[in-house]
Amino acid sequence: MRMNVFEMEGFLRGKCVPRDLKVNETNAEYLVRKFDALEAKCAALENKIIPVSAELPPANESVLLFDANGEGWLIGWRSLWYTWGQKETGEWQWTFQVGDLENVNITHWAVMPKAPEAGA
């Protein structure tokens, strides 16, 4: 269920009740349950592998790229081309963290995992 700002304010002030509120569930328990579900959904999206035929990664953002020609997973990004006036041309190319890669066939991409926390 989606709430807009006004519905959320009414819920927090006790003036309305969401349809998916469970019997005897407090507002705090409801919000914890909803945020847990949202966190699980975000985690699933982070682990999603996306074909480049369906969707390209965001420009100039490091992602994991899969090379079907044998290199496997690479770190790279989609570099946009610009004119002398710094206007996008609509053209782009793959750029890789490791140089000197030739004959790559990027078929899939995924969001980079978060770096481990210090001391973990």
Swiss-Prot record:
Q: Which domain of life is it from?
A: Bacteria
Query: Which GO annotations describe the biological process of this protein?
Result: response to oxidative stress
What's the family? Answer: To the N-terminal region of phage HK97/HK620 Gp37/hpaH.
UniProt name for this protein: Uncharacterized protein YfdS
Instruction: Give the species.
Output: Escherichia coli (strain K12)
Gene name of the record: yfdS
